[in-house]
């Protein structure tokens, strides 16, 4: 069974207005893909399953905080998961991407969909980003778990939640990360790929 915009809207209960924004984002992604490699070419036809659903599933893992969550999306690339989270109203999202042409795309989507109140694009390496305290740190198809912890720790408190979609090598990544970091982690099955898991981590500290 194919999975598209209609299936996504049903699964995540999105309004017509939100659905229209997601549709426009998908159109822009396809338009800008040529020459930019925002997502893998082999996933263009399955982007709602592979990218939109994979990103949106994180919303079910967000705890009740009593305020709008502040997210850090490391290596935002084509906007997954950060732009999907912003469109769905999951909080205030800071998208960090070092490649300028990808940032131009991200900013174009923010402007087109009027997301400037909840999504901020930073064209820099995460190490150069001014420090702030994130409630949630996420990253997708960016780096291994240990590297993400290294990059994200300056923005984390002990209460910061890490939501990190990972592929089939997740077990090895967790084992390797434990060599340099202490953390609690749960591996949640992914809705978008039976081989994938979401690392839900907290209490991350260097050893």
Question: Model regions: which residues?
Answer:
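Class I SAM-dependent transferase core
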Residues: 1-72, 101-115
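Residue-level signal for inorganic ion chemistry
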Residues: 29, 85, 166
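Active-site capping/gating segments
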Residues: 91-94, 167-207
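Alpha-helical transmembrane segments of helical membrane proteins, especially in multi-pass transport
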Residues: 139-146, 153
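Conserved SAM/SAH cofactor-binding pocket of Class I
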Residues: 56-134, 138, 149
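A short glycine-rich, Lys/Arg-flanked "PGG" loop and its adjoining helix->strand segment in the class I
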Residues: 149-162
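Short hydrophobic/aromatic-enriched beta-strand-loop microsegments
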Residues: 121, 159-164, 185
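Short strand-turn motif at the edge of the Rossmann-like AdoMet-binding core
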Residues: 98, 126, 142, 165-169
